[in-house]
From Swiss-Prot:
UniProt GO BP: translation
Gene responsible for this protein: rpmA
GO molecular function: structural constituent of ribosome
One matching Pfam family: Ribosomal_L27
Protein's organism: Mycolicibacterium gilvum (strain PYR-GCK) (Mycobacterium gilvum (strain PYR-GCK))
Positions of the UniProt region annotated as Disordered: 1-22
Signal peptide range: none
Protein name (database record): Large ribosomal subunit protein bL27
Amino acid sequence: MAHKKGASSSRNGRDSNAQRLGVKRFGGQVVKAGEILVRQRGTHFHPGVNVGRGGDDTLFATAPGAVEFGTKRGRKYVNIVRTVRSEA
């Protein structure tokens, strides 16, 4: 057993909290306006139709509808497809 702590062990012992990033609403799910779709750092997913982008690159729905993921010219996009309600 060492009687001294060692070179850097006394400077260790910190860890940061997880950032909870990732896709929050998946393809086909119905969302309301304002719901967060993707939390990300940088634009891994780009905003498409009826999707806005926040200051921290979070994607959110700007209109109600179903979530749709797709690619265009090598970029991944998230769209909101408006669902047609039948008045019954």
